[in-house]
Amino acid sequence: MKFNKIVALALALVMVFALCACGGGTDTTNPDDSGSTAKVDTNTVSVGAVVIARDDVPTDEIYAFVSTIFENLDAITAQHAKGAELSLEAAASVKGVPYHPGAAKYFEEKGVKVDAVKEGAGNGTASALSFGTGGESGTYYAFGGVLASFVSGKSDCKVTALTSGGSQANVEDLANGNVQLAFVQSDVMNYAYNGQRLFDSPVTGFSVVAQLYQEQVQIVTTNPDIKTVADLAGKKVSIGAAGSGVYFNAIDVLNAYDLKESDISAVYQSFGDSAESLKDGKIDAAFIVAGAPTTAITDLATAGSVYLVSLDDSHVQSLLAASPYYTAATIKAGTY
């Protein structure tokens, strides 16, 4: 009997050591009320990921770009999971900024009508297209590279994906002729077109190609005690590059919880730098706005447990009421 007790104790100790050894995992969850981790959905808001083009890109080039993508969604999805989120209805749903004639032509052939078409666009000379995406640790770059490679290989439209500083930089590069195509957040696109927030005057020399998927506002932390946005008060938080789309999304969310920028210790970093700072313990949390799963968070999760902070329903509704660019969103448990 005494021997059996010794064996049982030994087995229990082995299990404890095994659990301790596995403590830092890739479990991206958000903490429940007890402070432990729970595999649950994360409620948040999202903005659209939109491809825009310079007005002088020829109609045939944009038609080839859009048609090649939407006629080959299964093959694209096999290369990147975001392909599964694309639909004709969502692609043609943008309002407030007119569509490029090449995109409108394809959508209308498929029986989907866009809200407005840019007059006088599409009359430039055909050439290879540079596609401004985003930083290497974001979804824009990864998915943009897949789209560029696929379109170039399956059509006469030749596209090269380039890294960039994100939405605002992409609009500026597009306006300056450095790129012909670009990814932008839907809210930043409208700010540019109307000369608001990030932009001192309207930027109107572009038109919509397609809205491809939703970009979730993801609040990431390695601290399980940060359970709500209110818990960010007094913490060191990365809120994106100063003046970026992420910055304004972060400010909107903080304001919804009656927090000002001065109520946190704000740092202004890219997705990749935010992930590195979280891993090194230099910051407490970070706002990352990108289609989930996002490379920066996935990579961070390989180094230890990370948590997504959920927005409660009342604050989601406040954000929806305050801005026409937000949509309620859910990041499913197990995404990371």
Language model features by range: what are they?
Residues 145-149, 160-201, 219, 227, ...:
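Pocket-flanking alpha-helical
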Residues 130, 160-161, 180-185, 218-220, ...:
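Structural recognition of the beta-strand scaffold that forms the well-ordered cores
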